[in-house]
């Protein structure tokens, strides 16, 4: 309505009246079907499953919104009912242009690639800054990390992230401190755009609380950029991943890879193309 305010005014229609009639809730979603190769030793079994996600976003006022995401999973190899649950539920409040706070179960991707973590975070994250340089300070639980205290309770963690972009570079530095000395992790990531379509990228993380300070790193080369709003766009990439035993806790962005074997079983190193 705002784009055609003058034309509507000439017709005697008040834009403000139209805006009052527009709902403050928006919906979006996606669905997928996939086949996944198993990597759990001799008992590894391939999976063929489906998933649908529906997100609802509601503006409370100009500074606050509530957002929730429902997820339903099903396995095409059995006859069980789909498992439907609330995957994300957050409240976000913006204090001016450069300070915001998000409370609840929220998406969290670490590094340039998500190799170290790409899943939900249960807690609070305060964000300071802008797209060029921002600081996140958070406290809560990494949902997919199976970390327990001596009494069996879940382990909280402090998260600090400094990230941004300038020119052809995108960068981040991260620190994670877990309760009961279960992890003290430092990480760095960098993406350099060589041209408008070609980039090199990498991440590095080290856990200084584990024996021998195990580390995980990845480096790769990518071509193209996927934009879901633009049909025909695509991206292909290849990267090398090296993860020492005890360097990761799970929930990598790569579902079809053996990186979870490095949680407690063995070192892994491999090439990944996508």
Can you describe what each PLM-predicted range is?
Residues 1-32:
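N-terminal periplasmic/intermembrane-space "pro-region" immediately following the signal or transit peptide
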Residues 30, 51-55, 69, 88-92, ...:
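One-face residue pattern on beta-strands with alternating periodicity enriched for small/polar residues
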